[in-house]
């Protein structure tokens, strides 16, 4: 399970998650891409206004978490996307959120999950915590930007690795980011 997250909006988390899923598909792996941030349909050029993760979490008497794959949209390039959905996280049933977290953490299939910005996400902690903490790859997506990195010391969660979005003209580099984060770039 690959979980992509950031500490600042606009860091590129959605693009990195999409890239990971599409790269896996090119290698013959058919990952399930799960959008908890809401931007993946637009990035991938597919319709995402239908039911998704939040709708499943809000359906009190709905089917089990294995049915989530039935909500997947085929994406050109060989991956499948479960969109965020049309319900808000505030409508989610606590038991369904916990069941989803358990299902995803125990899944044997290839997963790429876009959590988005941890600082502003409305994803329930009962889902967010297990995903970030138990991910095979917990990937902090950041730019070599002081504003992005200054939030890290206050963050309880630590990534297993960093996806550094490189931009010309930045004063910070790879070694600076590794030193601050304490994880490989």
Residue ranges and their predicted role:
Residues 27-80:
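Phosphate-binding loop that captures ATP/GTP phosphates
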Residues 99-106, 110-185:
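Conserved catalytic-core segment of NTP-binding enzymes
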Residues 27-28, 49, 53-59, 87, ...:
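Cytoplasmic membrane-interface segments at the C-terminal ends of transmembrane helices
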